[in-house]
Amino acid sequence: MTHEFTESYDVIVIGAGHAGVEASLATSRMGCKTLLATINLDMLAFMPCNPSIGGSAKGIVVREIDALGGEMGKNIDKTYIQMKMLNTGKGPAVRALRAQADKSLYAREMKHTVEKQANLTLRQTMIDDILVEDGRVVGVLTATGQKFAAKAVVVTTGTALRGEIILGELKYSSGPNNSLASVTLADNLKKLGLEIGRFKTGTPPRVKASSINYDQTEIQPGDDKPNHFSFMSKDADYLKDQIPCWLTYTNQTSHDIINQNLYRAPMFSGVVKGVGPRYCPSIEDKIVRFADKERHQLFLEPEGRDTEEVYVQGLSTSLPEDVQKDLIHSIKGLEKAEMMRTGYAIEYDIVLPHQLRATLETKLISGLFTAGQTNGTSGYEEAAGQGLIAGINAALKVQGKPELILKRSDAYIGVMIDDLVTKGTLEPYRLLTSRAEYRLILRHDNADMRLTEIGRDIGLVDDERWKAFEIKKNQFDNELKRLDSIKLKPIKETNDRVQDLGFKPLTDAMTAKEFMRRPEIDYATAVSFVGPAAEDLDAKIIELLETEIKYEGYIRKALDQVAKMKRMEEKRIPANIDWDAIDSIATEARQKFKKINPETIGQASRISGVNPADISILMIYLEGNGKAHRKY
C-alpha cells in the first residue's frame, strides 16, 4: 500500500508522559528529527498519582537516567519541595534518594525543556494507528486522517490505552486524571499481531491542606544535608525552606468502614478485571489481605507550594465517594478534612513485554518500540528509564549504528528491562533492590561512574557534563592510588594516636587504604594520619572512596560473578533455531524458549522454569548445530 504522508520524521513518539518525554529528548538530542505526539499538551510529564520522584531502587534509576544524559534528575532538582535520603541506617547498596515534587511546576518545567529542544516538534494530536509495510514501521495515522512518515515509532501511552476509570459503581472510558482514552490505537496494536494484557492501578483521594489537623499527626521533615538527583546540581542550590510531610494511620473504625462496604468495592464486586500492583495495593485490599494489622501508615504529602491539595499516600481506593468521605473522616488528623478529589482505579491495556527485545523494540515489527506502563511497569521512574533506552535505540536504529543494551550488571534499568523481556510480568512491575543480584555495584553514589561514558559515546552527554565527570573520576582515581601507596607502620607514635582514638593498635604495616577498611576508620580519620589529598575533594567523592574501599572484597566477588555471566551473554542463540529439534530438553523449558525466544545463553538461563540441565543440553546442541545468525 502506498501512503501519502503530509509530514516526515525520523522518529515519532506517541505519548508525552515520563517515558515519552525521555524518549523524545534522547532521539532529538542524538540528531533525529522527532515528533512528540500527545493527546493533551497540558498533561506533558504530568504526575497523575504520587507527587514524588525516587525512592527505594527508583531513586537509583533516576541517577542512572541522569548519568546517561536524560532529563528527569535535572528537572526534579529544579522543582522539589522536599528531599530525603532513604535507608541511611542500612548498607550503601540500598540507599536511595526521594523527593517530594511540586507536581505542576515539575510538568511546567519539563514542558519548557521540550519546547526549547532542537529537532523536536511537540504536537497535540491523537494517534490512531501505526502504519506498517513488509514487517517494518513506516509512519502513523492521526484521528484527523493525517499520515506522518517515520523510520521508527516509540509507543509510550501509559494508562491511556483503552483506559477506564472506576469509582464505586461508576465506570467510564478515560485516561489518567480524566484525560481522553486511546481506544482506536489499542485496537490497532492488537490487529498488528501484538499480544495485549490488561492491568489496573489506582490513586488515593486528595484532601485540602487547611482542613487538616496537623497537631494530630507526626511531622516528616526533609534532610538538612544536601543531596541531588543530578550529578550536575550544586550543593549551594540545595533548598533550605523545604515543606514537611506528615504521618498518620488508619484505625479500627477505618477498617470497619471498609469491611462494611466491601460489597460496593469494585475490587471485590467483580467490576475490576485487570491485575493490580502487588507493591502498591488499594487500602481495601490491604485490609482484607492483612486483617491482623491494627493500623496502616498514611503519609500526607503536599502536591506543591501553590496548591491546597494533599495526597494521602497509602489510601489508594476505588470505593464509592460517600465511603471515601467516611473513611477519611475516621482517620486521626483528617476528622474534618475536605476531600478535593476522590480516589479511583484505572484499567488499561499493555503490550505483554516478552514480545520485546532488550532494546525495547518489538520482535514482531521492525522499528516499533514500546516503553513505560505500556510495557506493564508501574512508576514514573521505571517509565522514564525505559523511555530513555527506547529513544536511544530508536535513534541508533535510524542512524544505522549498533544498539545499546544495558546488562543487569550495568544498571537497575538493565535489570528491569531484562526482567520484562525474559520473564514477562503478570502484574504491574515495580523495581526493588532485591531484584538486582549485583546491587552492591549498582549504587546511588556510582551511577555516573557506571554510565556517563556510555552516555558520551551515544551523544547524550555534553561537553560541560563530560568535563565535570573527567575531573571527578581523575580525583577519585588519584586519591585511591595515593591511599594505596602510603604505608602506616606499627610504630609507637602511630599506635598511640590510634589508641587515643579508641581503636585497636596496628600489628603490621598497612596502606592507608587497608587502614580505611576497618569499620571504624572513615576517610577523615585516615587522612589525619597520612595527610590530605593534593586538592580539596568534594564530599561525594569522599563518600564514594569510603564505599569502594570498605566493601572492596564484596565488590570484587560481584565483579567476578559479572565476568562469568558475561561469557554466557556472549554465547548467541540463532534467531531461526528450531526448539523442537533439541532432544531431551524439558517440556516446560521448550515452551518457555518458544515464547521468549532468548537471544543469548545468559538470557535463556534466567527464564523461570528453565533448569541448568536444559541449558547444558542447549549449549551442546548449539555447539553442533548453531551456525545461523540472528537478524532483525
Curated annotation (Swiss-Prot):
Concerning InterPro entries, the annotation shows: FAD/NAD-bd_sf (IPR036188), GIDA_C_N (IPR049312), MnmG (IPR004416), MnmG-rel (IPR002218), MnmG-rel_CS (IPR020595), MnmG_C (IPR026904), MnmG_C_subdom (IPR047001), MnmG_C_subdom_sf (IPR044920)
Instruction: List the PROSITE patterns.
Output: GIDA_1 (PS01280), GIDA_2 (PS01281)
Please list the GO biological process terms of this entry: tRNA methylation; tRNA wobble uridine modification
Q: Which segments does the entry list as coiled coil?
A: none
Q: Where does FAD bind?
A: 15-20, 127, 182, 373
Gene Ontology cellular-component terms listed: cytosol
Supply the Pfam families for this chain.
GIDA, GIDA_C_1st, SAM_GIDA_C
Q: How does it assemble?
A: Homodimer. Heterotetramer of two MnmE and two MnmG subunits.
What this chain does, per the entry, is described as: NAD-binding protein involved in the addition of a carboxymethylaminomethyl (cmnm) group at the wobble position (U34) of certain tRNAs, forming tRNA-cmnm(5)s(2)U34.
Family, as annotated: Belongs to the MnmG family.
Q: What is this protein's record name?
A: tRNA uridine 5-carboxymethylaminomethyl modification enzyme MnmG
Which source organism? Streptococcus pyogenes serotype M2 (strain MGAS10270)
Q: What does the organism's lineage look like at the top?
A: Bacteria, Bacillati, Bacillota, Bacilli, Lactobacillales
Gene expressing this chain: mnmG
